[in-house]
């Protein structure tokens, strides 16, 4: 069986149920080994005309057959059925609970991992952990623990019975077993390695398929269906080859076990027949001995299956352990406080930041203050560091001490949950869940009423679009919201953030897909609905932020200027150049449309 720090706790947690299953297993194995004795009685009764029962020699009559053989056999079968049902419920039920608990632990750990982890590890690979690898662990925990105890208990009991009948014959029968044990150990190591390769190949295949399904529109637009099919075939072929290799090893192990069983039977028949010829065994005793050996055939087969399942289980557990051992880079420090009654002030104080895997500082000596109730725009060319500011405010990454303050308190002294709870966020990708529009808008507020959802949709200027849908707010969106337009996705995302009514609202380039008229309506609604609340708006178009209280202009990770639009246009040449270029682009676009 497999053991490890993430599995042992579940063995202990399910110990009472497993103990009950083990007791049922012991009962079944014990009474199962009574059956060969009845074989002896029947054979000797037929051959000799009499049987020895409890030290008494009795004539082999129908009454004796019924009383001492048939009725006890019926009771044995009934008890075996009850016992097997009981231990299956105990062992397999525990396996299901272990898998559920482990999957829940994985999910709980996954949600605490930093954004950097998800940038390195692909979704398809992670999903295979929750499906294939968890299923393997469940199979190993259920079937594996059953096989282990059944093979151990039944095998030892049967060997004891065989040893008492004739130890020399038993020693001869054990020689192939020792050889088989050595071969199985070597092959088990090889199977563990191959199973890890198999799971990784499946993960790569799943990840490739997931990316293709998500990006099918792009693939079709660039007419790359055939190219992607060829790439999929290559990965699928690799997956097939690894599976074939693993299957060959597993099949070879099964063949060797069968060879071992047949070899032992030959030994028993040969030497056992000799013992009968010598008069040391009678025919009934030889049949009884073979019955005991038949009882350990299952443990022998179970050993090969156990080697395979354990090899697979260890490989899957190693992959899951990598996830559970992944460090939680962004976490609360001991003794943090909750952010009580947040007002919405934000201050960056000489902050310099580099992404964990970055080669240069994306933000350099950033200092500015946002007072409660202010509406602030952050502009700059692509790569200037605008989104990095949002990442730090939302504590997606660790923040250097003494560089970021919310309501005058260092964010490192506040719980991450309370800081994020004080913010409402509209991300660049405008992610939507594959759920109804109502659930998407109400995601950030528990038990949001239909009236609240409708009001938020009106503020985001998307209500008219929603009511035009056949099912209105109950319209189910496709994966990541693919069934609505880019502008509708943005406005639904904005409605979701507005419904939360948080002290701090962050919009990361969140009106880029709407026209200027709709943009003006949304910005006017933001201004009227968020009086005395802080709004932070990251934008590429200057027209989006020019009416805000102040603008922070970033250039190559540094603050170039801070102030209202008119002031920056007059005092900052780089800002003025950006404004003029955008105006020229707008005018050129207008001429082209004309």
Stretches with model-predicted labels:
Residues 2, 91, 111-155:
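Juxtamembrane loop-to-helix connectors within ABC transporter transmembrane domains
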Residues 12-13, 115-116, 132-141, 145, ...:
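An intracellular "coupling" helix at the cytosolic face of ABC transporter transmembrane type-1 domains
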Residues 16-41, 69, 73, 88-92, ...:
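Alpha-helical segments in transporter systems
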Residues 106, 110, 219, 320, ...:
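Helix-loop junctions and hydrophobic alpha-helical segments within the transmembrane domains
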Residues 161-175, 245, 249-318, 323-324:
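Helix-loop-helix
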Residues 332, 339-594:
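ABC-type nucleotide-binding domain
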